[in-house]
Swiss-Prot record:
Subcellular location as annotated: Host nucleus
Keyword Amino-acid biosynthesis among UniProt keywords: no
One of the GO BP terms on file: regulation of DNA replication
Species: Human papillomavirus 35
Family to which the UniProt record says this protein belongs: Belongs to the papillomaviridae E8^E2C protein family.
Keywords: Host nucleus
Annotated S-S bridges: none
GO MF, one annotated term: DNA binding
Upper lineage: Viruses, Monodnaviria, Shotokuvirae, Cossaviricota, Papovaviricetes
GO CC entries: host cell nucleus
Annotated Pfam families: PPV_E2_C
Job description of the protein: Plays a role in limiting the replication of viral DNA in keratinocytes. Recruits the host NCoR/SMRT complex to viral replication foci to mediate repression of both viral replication and transcription.
Name of the protein this chain belongs to: Protein E8^E2C
SUPFAM superfamilies: Viral DNA-binding domain (SSF54957)
Length: 178
């Protein structure tokens, strides 16, 4: 308990709370509960829920934002760095900020079935999107799209030569900046 009082006094100038109050607040702040609900006969699903942060006049015994430097969401370092020798940032396949992609366009149900069949070729692509479509178009046909990403252009070319794409599906090659 002495450590808890020390932490509290370190981050707050007032030491009006008792040891029991500090311990109660720390416990409420740091614990999680698990709730179990019935899914079907004989099975259960467990969900973890976090306690909500204390609001109002009750202060936490320590202020974590004083120790942690916060940054904006869009400035998070994701380990992606661009190369300085790249001259065309929009279509450059050699830049580390772009990845080769393929858009598969066609009927939504056909694309969904194709995406499930692609599971056996997982080594030939990196990621596959869900079936999606552009929302603000005047096109009455409403063509659906599945986007596949690759680590290299070689992997994309190997995919396109190996996997049989149905005739009703249009293939568009390109790059996506990440």
């Amino acid at each position: 308990m002495a450590i808890l009082k020390w932490k509290y006094s370190r981050y707050n100038s007032s030491t009006e709370l008792s040891t029991a109050e500090i311990a109660t607040q720390l416990h409420a702040y740091n614990t999680t509960e698990t709730h179990t609900k019935a899914c079907s006969v004989g099975t259960t699903e467990t969900q973890k829920t976090n306690h909500k942060r204390l609001r109002g006049g009750t202060e936490l015994p320590y202020n974590p934002t004083k120790r942690v430097r916060l940054s904006a969401v869009d400035s998070v370092d994701r380990g992606v760095y661009s190369t300085s020798d790249c001259t065309n940032k929009d279509r450059c396949g050699s830049c580390s900020t772009t990845t080769p992609i393929v858009h598969l366009k066609g009927d939504a149900n056909t694309l969904k079935c194709l995406r499930y069949r692609l599971g056996k070729y997982k080594a030939l692509y990196q990621d596959a999107s869900s079936t999606w479509r552009w929302t603000c178009t005047n096109d009455k046909k409403q063509i659906a799209i599945v986007t596949l990403t690759y680590t290299t252009e070689y992997q994309r070319d190997k995919f396109l030569t190996t996997v049989k794409i149905p005739n009703t599906v249009t293939v568009s090659k390109g790059y996506m900046s990440i």
